[in-house]
């Protein structure tokens, strides 16, 4: 079995880096040893059940999802080689699922830190007023970057915002008082940058709709200028919106609607609560966790 692995690696030697070949060798050697321990000494006997057992054993051994996904990719490429060589008639690895990668969510900005950041005075120029309106709208509505840059002036009225999210799903969002005030300031100055025929809500110095990269750069620059000691990007403001709202309201369904998530499970992952908050909620709500007054000794 090990000879077949070496032949496969040799066939890749002109196309793969030494590091990739070493990783493939480790992954395939681990599979060969697993099969040999099960009494299998021929690659022709490899089937989907054995692949699943091997991946399960590796998961039990503590391999991280990223490592499991890499290992599965190596096995699949080797199985394709076995099919081309006539040893297998199909790739059994292709019938298994890729291990799910954990979602690495941005840490929400502390509520007080974010309030100080948003309340920092600016110089009142059209660009500064525009930036303040963008910041307030990001945090007030939890918008995605693409949703904010796609906004037209006609998408807003005094207290409500119309957004077209992922999958062309429309939703309506309430606008907080601070964001309303910041938008009113921007409306008064927007005409100094935007032409009469420009529909975009947020425009740059040349009067055209702001692009994604321009907004990302402005947020990072504002964080530095205002002394926010953390990297700031649109998704982090969205996550802060969701986390702060959920911590205050405990209404997961409402947060799901505001974020524009199709599935509640997405919101549950996206808006994780800190452990202390969950523990406090448990202590207050669960009948066997509530603290009772000590018995009267008299």
Curated annotation (Swiss-Prot):
- Give residue ranges for domain Tyr recombinase: 104-283
Active site residues per record: 144, 166, 235, 238, 261, 270
Keyword set, alphabetical order: Cell cycle, Cell division, Chromosome partition, Cytoplasm, DNA integration, DNA recombination, DNA-binding
* InterPro entries with a match to the protein in the record: CB (IPR044068), DNA_brk_join_enz (IPR011010), Integrase-like_cat_sf (IPR013762), Integrase_catalytic (IPR002104), Integrase_recombinase_N (IPR010998), Integrase_SAM-like_N (IPR004107), Tyrosine_recombinase_XerC/XerD (IPR023009), Tyrosine_recombinase_XerCD (IPR050090)
Compartment(s) where it occurs, according to its Swiss-Prot or TrEMBL record:
Cytoplasm
What GO molecular function annotations does the UniProt record carry, in alphabetical order?
DNA binding; tyrosine-based site-specific recombinase activity
Q: Which cysteines are joined by disulfide bonds?
A: none
Core-binding (CB) domain mapped to chain residues: 1-83
Superkingdom of the organism of origin: Bacteria
GO cellular-component terms in the record? cytoplasm
Checking SUPFAM superfamilies in the record gives: DNA breaking-rejoining enzymes
Asked whether the keyword Cell cycle is assigned, the reply is yes
Q: What is its main location?
A: cytoplasm
Q: Which PROSITE patterns match?
A: CB, TYR_RECOMBINASE
Gene3D superfamilies per the UniProt record, alphabetical: 1.10.150.130, Intergrase catalytic core
A Gene Ontology annotation in the biological process aspect, one of them, is: chromosome segregation
- What does the similarity note say? Belongs to the 'phage' integrase family. XerC subfamily.
Q: How does it assemble?
A: Forms a cyclic heterotetrameric complex composed of two molecules of XerC and two molecules of XerD.
Query: Record's PANTHER family?
Result: PHAGE INTEGRASE-RELATED, TYROSINE RECOMBINASE XERC
> What the protein does?
Site-specific tyrosine recombinase, which acts by catalyzing the cutting and rejoining of the recombining DNA molecules. The XerC-XerD complex is essential to convert dimers of the bacterial chromosome into monomers to permit their segregation at cell division. It also contributes to the segregational stability of plasmids.
Can you name this protein?
Answer: Tyrosine recombinase XerC
Q: Which organism is it from?
A: Chromohalobacter salexigens (strain ATCC BAA-138 / DSM 3043 / CIP 106854 / NCIMB 13768 / 1H11)
The upper taxonomy is:
Bacteria, Pseudomonadati, Pseudomonadota, Gammaproteobacteria, Oceanospirillales
Gene name on record? xerC
């Amino acid at each position: 079995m090990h000879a077949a692995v070496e032949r496969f690696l040799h066939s890749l030697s002109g196309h793969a880096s030494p590091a990739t070949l070493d990783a493939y060798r480790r992954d395939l050697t681990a599979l060969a040893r697993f099969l040999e321990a099960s009494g299998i000494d021929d690659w022709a006997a490899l089937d989907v059940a054995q692949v699943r057992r091997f991946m399960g054993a590796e998961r039990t051994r503590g391999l991280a999802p990223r490592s499991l996904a890499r290992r599965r990719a190596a096995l699949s490429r080797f199985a394709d080689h076995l099919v081309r060589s006539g040893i297998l008639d199909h790739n059994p690895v292709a019938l298994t699922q890729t291990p799910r990668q954990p979602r690495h969510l941005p840490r929400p900005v502390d509520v007080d830190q974010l309030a100080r950041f948003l309340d920092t005075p600016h110089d009142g120029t059209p660009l500064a007023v525009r930036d303040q309106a963008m910041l307030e709208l990001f945090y007030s509505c939890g918008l995605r970057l693409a949703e904010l840059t796609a906004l037209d002036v006609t998408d807003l009225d005094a207290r409500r915002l119309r957004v077209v999210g992922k999958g062309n799903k429309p939703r309506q969002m309430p606008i907080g008082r601070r964001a309303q005030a910041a938008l009113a300031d921007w409306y008064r100055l927007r005409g100094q940058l935007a032409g009469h025929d420009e529909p975009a809500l947020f425009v740059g110095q040349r009067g055209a709709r702001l692009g994604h990269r321009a907004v990302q750069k402005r947020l990072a620059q504002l964080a530095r200028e205002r002394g926010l000691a953390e990297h700031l990007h649109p998704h982090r403001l969205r996550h802060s919106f969701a986390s702060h709202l959920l911590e205050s309201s405990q209404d997961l369904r409402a947060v799901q609607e505001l974020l524009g998530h199709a599935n509640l499970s997405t919101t549950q992952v996206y808006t994780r609560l800190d452990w202390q908050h969950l523990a406090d909620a448990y202590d207050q709500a669960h009948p066997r966790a509530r603290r009772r007054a000590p018995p009267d000794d008299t």
